[in-house]
Amino acid sequence: MMPTKSLPDRTMEALKEAVQYAYECQFDNDHWSGEVHSNPIFTAEYLFLRQALGLDFTQDEKDGFIRWFLLQQNEDGSYGLAPDYPGDPSTTVESYLSLKMLGYPIDKPEMVQARDYMLRTDGMKNVRIFTRFFLATFGLWPWDYIPQLPLELMLMPQRSPVNIYTLSSWARATCIPLLVVRHHQPIYALPNGAHKDNDFLDELWNDPSNKKIPYSQSLWQMVGKEDLTTIAFTAADKVISLLGGFRKFPGRRYLRRTVVDWLVMHQEHSGDWGGYWPPMHGTILALVLEGFPLNHPVIRSGMEAVERYAMHDKNGRRYQATTCALWDTAVMTVALADCGLVRPNNVRLTNTVEWFLKRQCRGTEGDWRVYRPELQPGGWSFQDIDNWYPDVDDTAIVILGLLKHYPTSINSEHIIRGMNWILGMQNPDGGWAAFDWNNDKLFLNKIPFGDMESLCDPTTADVTGRLVECLGHFIRSPHAHTVDADFLRTVETSAQRGIRWLLDNQEPFGAWWGRWGVNYVYGTSNVLSGLHYFMHKGDDELNLAISRAVEWVKSVQLEDGGWGEGLSSYDDPALAGKGSPSTASQTAWSIMSLIPYVPATDPAVTRGVDFLVRFQTLLGSDHAYDRGKTGKNGKSWPEDYYTGTGFPGHLYLQYCLNPHYWPMMALGRYLRKAKGAGLTGHLEDELEGFPEPVV
């Protein structure tokens, strides 16, 4: 009988398979770009755009869309924000409208079930503002019952607490084109024609004769119930409505031209706007309403960019909310470094470095300049190309990847520029947000159009944790002595300010909230991955915070050895770390939370590592590369639950490479820890000579 292999042995085998799979998935031998799964709304709104522009669909396109929409439906007929997530009326009505536009018969069982869900829940009265907005463009909702979006917002000075630059980058890029659309109030044709009072969706209403559904309480109802800010914004909206939305006021033509100029200026050379679907959709509609023909170079390149969001496979045709080439490549680069099986002179790796360097944002673009005009550019973006909106999280993880593979590059121009940029983007409160500086005017979420509560980009624990990790790795680098001493002190001071914010914002139960990943498991992992660089004897406050977080991570481990947290924890903190079966990515995050602080033999770590090793499969995730890049060799991990976050409570994502690079990273860090403890035995030869990642 063959002796049972040790956990380090099995981990090494799993890592080799994972590296092979990663190689198979690489595009052009220099980058990775997995699909971003979300909910059906983005595909639906692509169809709305095509319908509004009068662009026909081929039968093959129709069949592909129909097949995909039907696969997304819940058993009760609804459509949710994520697979197996409770029904959402906005997602359901947009999916139903899409299927009906495509010619799918309304007497089919799937349509009957969706209709029954909407009627049973009185869903039409509860759709979000954006859904109302796009229904109004087809005459399916009265424009009078949509909040105002006055073009005069463009006139507000930058020092005002309410102006386009106090909105978050994504809200700004989305809302500015909608100012023009709201001004024009178009009515586009559906298959039954163009009608101001179109009855195309009347079967979804319990009372189709009354579609005048208020989007807020009356001012009288608000008195004594709502805060003064909400009342003031609502009152302003009512006044603007009474004045006809200012449409006939002097200067409207100038304001429309101002918006058009802003939109054209913000188009990337690739044709994109904002690297995210809503700005693409709204901007094309706005420019066409302002007289741009469909063959205009701006519109043509914009439509070409839209098509790069398309995915088509056996499951049907759909459109992504965004793309994530730079993020995927950066995280994969760190994972390859941490697993210790890729030499720095590997041609794939050197090609990836060149790919990164070409994409550093060093031009004159960038809305971040409005409030940080003296700061030198040097960030990286989330997408392949998004020069207007680099973000500090991506910049930090690119720097980590470069430093882990090439420690001697610490003084290179690209890294120093990147470091200077993220230092300059640190918020006055000591933490970091994703895209903007000091973007914390949370009262803006009280405007009638802010029902998704995502109009700002304040400091968050997960981003701050990543930045502390990046700064800590920079300071503790074996080549840090080659860096200017004053600059190192600046980095140290910045890190300490970030740590102070994290200590002040730890949850009572020991975890940290995750803005961009689900949820407390993600936030806590990012924070603990950074704090260990700054542990030292005598700092009782920091050590206590770490101890509480480590104990919390251990307390939510599942019986199978993994970790799983559901989306519902965003609605109910009592569900933090709970509510989902174990997932590969969340298990990896949790292992990385623990590795710096406990022995490699700690039961929580070994059970977690064992879970990842056991659940690695030949096919990995069903959501892996459907663009002809599914790994034919190597292994990955299955993951059907969404672990990425767009807007908590409103948009959830699954990055199809999440269940690959995070487990690689975790297993690599475990193996290094095991090596340090003398547990790797005969594996020493395989581990010898590789750069030693700091874990």
Swiss-Prot record:
A single GO CC term for this protein reads: lipid droplet
Task: Name the keywords, alphabetized.
Answer: Isomerase, Repeat
Q: Name one GO molecular function term.
A: intramolecular transferase activity
**Ranges: PFTB repeats:** 62-103, 256-296, 415-456, 546-593
Pathway terms, separated by semicolons: Secondary metabolite biosynthesis; terpenoid biosynthesis
According to UniProt, residues marked as the site described as Transition state stabilizer are 327, 382, 516
Highest taxon of source: Eukaryota
Give the EC class as a word.
Answer: isomerase
Q: How is it used?
A: Polytolypin and biosynthesis intermediate compounds show antifungal activity and can efficiently inhibit the growth of the pathogenic funfus Candida albicans.
GO terms, biological process: triterpenoid biosynthetic process
Name the chemical reaction catalysed here: (S)-2,3-epoxysqualene = motiol
The record's active-site residues are: 393
Q: Which residues cross the membrane?
A: none
The record describes its quaternary structure and partners as: Monomer.
Q: Which family does it belong to?
A: Belongs to the terpene cyclase/mutase family.
* Function of the protein: Triterpene cyclase; part of the gene cluster that mediates the biosynthesis of antifungal fernane-type triterpenoid polytolypin. PolA is dedicated to the biosynthesis of the fernane-type skeleton motiol from 2,3-oxidosqualene. Within the pathway, polC then converts the 4-alpha-methyl group of motiol to a carboxyl group, polB is responsible for appending a hydroxyl group at the 2-alpha position and polE is a dual functional P450, which can catalyze the formation of both the 1-beta-hydroxyl group and 10-beta-carboxyl group.
UniProt protein name: Triterpene cyclase polA
| Gene coding for it | polA
